[in-house]
Amino acid sequence: MRVGTFVLAAQFPGQGQGETLHRAVRSAEVAEESGLDSVWLAEHHFVPYGVCPSAVTLAALLLGRTQRIRVGTAVSVLPTAHPVALGEQAALLHLTSGGRFSLGVGRGGPWVDLEVFGPGLKAYEQGFPESLDLLLRWLREPRVSGAGERFSFREVPVVPRPDEILDGGPEDACPEVIVACTSPRSVKLAAERGLPMLLGMHCGDEDKAEMVALWRKQALAAGHAPEKVAAAGHVSAGVAQIADRRAEAAETLVKLMPGWLKQGLDAHVTVDGRHRAMRDPVAYTELLCGLHPVGTPRLAADRLAATSERTGITRFALLVEGSGDLSATEENVRRLGTEVLPLLT
């Protein structure tokens, strides 16, 4: 089982953005020190829900500050990025980190980002498959041209090429690409391309198991080898808060997370003025406490093991900054690595 952290760079009420980003960086450094497998970085624009606007840039910093841990984006928002530019960045990080970078991509939401960065609502509603396929071609082929509805350009060479990684085998020829999936449509899209899924922390085990089953069915129907389908490295996002008593862990989150959630979710603005109902912050926090490893080390290990058994997923990206406090976050990460991980081996 491969357990990592999910870093949103969440700005809690009363905190500055520099303070928030410092906590995000420190949580990743402590994750490596504590023996965790990976760090997954979120990306948001114009909202305190998360103050990292470029997951791939923060990934570059963390890859430079660490030696062993895998660093991934969860996710880079594809509709507001040029697939070739993102592909070049991914290839660069893949080569310079010795293959420790994973590129998670997703559609994002119908937010004002689409206006600011220029692609418009159509890129969000219809353009994701074209962007994803162009990105994959850039990471896998020596020369690429664009002939799609959104991206059209003459053939150019891929520089640098991911398959020129030093000391790598065939499995290292391309950085891992993973797709955030929230619907049967996105599951089918990922499965047809043989790409593993990132499944959100709002989903319970039953929903995730259904999505994994659908992915397997669609991947096999698309002609992917059964052994590749069986070995797909899907990632389950969740929340982790470790304490000596379950009530103490839950109390920490229920007391502190709703303030961040309300401030962050309320700040989202749709590009076309459509109404988007946001979750009740307290109810959502309580839901997360019930779904994920929130409690004692034994309870946390049991929850992770149960999720893995029910869904077949063995990789986890766990939000560890739910207290909003630097020292508490560092302690939470250390306990996850030193007290929970040993119970899973």
Across the structure, where does each feature detected by a protein language model lie?
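Internal, glycine-rich beta/alpha segment that forms the wall or movable "lid"
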Residues: 1, 82-195, 206-213, 217-230
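N-terminal beta1-alpha1-beta2 module of alpha/beta enzyme domains
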Residues: 1-71, 175
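Hydrophobic faces of well-ordered beta-strands that scaffold small-molecule active sites
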Residues: 3-7, 39-41, 71-73, 101-105, ...
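Active-site mouth loops of central-metabolism enzymes
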Residues: 7-22, 76-84, 171-181, 288-297
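Short, acidic/polar
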Residues: 18-30, 181-188, 299-306
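Conserved, mostly hydrophobic/aromatic
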Residues: 31, 35, 43, 62, ...
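Alpha-helix-loop-beta-strand connector modules within alpha/beta enzyme cores
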Residues: 52-73, 127, 131, 334-345
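An alpha-helical appendage that flanks or caps ligand/catalytic pockets
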Residues: 125-164, 206-314
